[in-house]
């Protein structure tokens, strides 16, 4: 009986260690440009507006993320060339040791989902998620496109 308890204890510890290491989310490798290209890879040309990629910097961060105090390593926005279409995807690579949950909350609370002329996205349709130190902000009017982008991000 003692042997069974010891074996059970050892197996339990091994299982816990395995689960704890499996749950640690790894950072997604690649430049913002490479990752953005992967996110859009499964879209047909006629499914999307004509998009432009814009580097997010201290001059335009408030427009894209809602708050100039967000610190990041790199960020890239994908937006339509015609501003009458509600479509914005922003990838943000945070600095090492950043409070990712805090940054996500700040983005979700402060970003303007009605920043375009005449169109917008409902606040509840704003998606802010992360994989490791990579955060995505998705504000897209079309639900199918929005969900497809979310899935593409989660599959990076």
Question: Which ranges hold each PLM region?
Answer:
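Bacterial N-terminal signal peptides that target proteins for export
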Residues: 1-11
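Soluble, non-membrane globular domain cores that form compact, hydrophobic packing
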Residues: 6, 23-156
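C-terminal motif of bacterial Sec signal peptides marking the signal peptidase cleavage site
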Residues: 18-22
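Gram-negative bacterial Sec-dependent N-terminal signal peptides
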Residues: 13-15
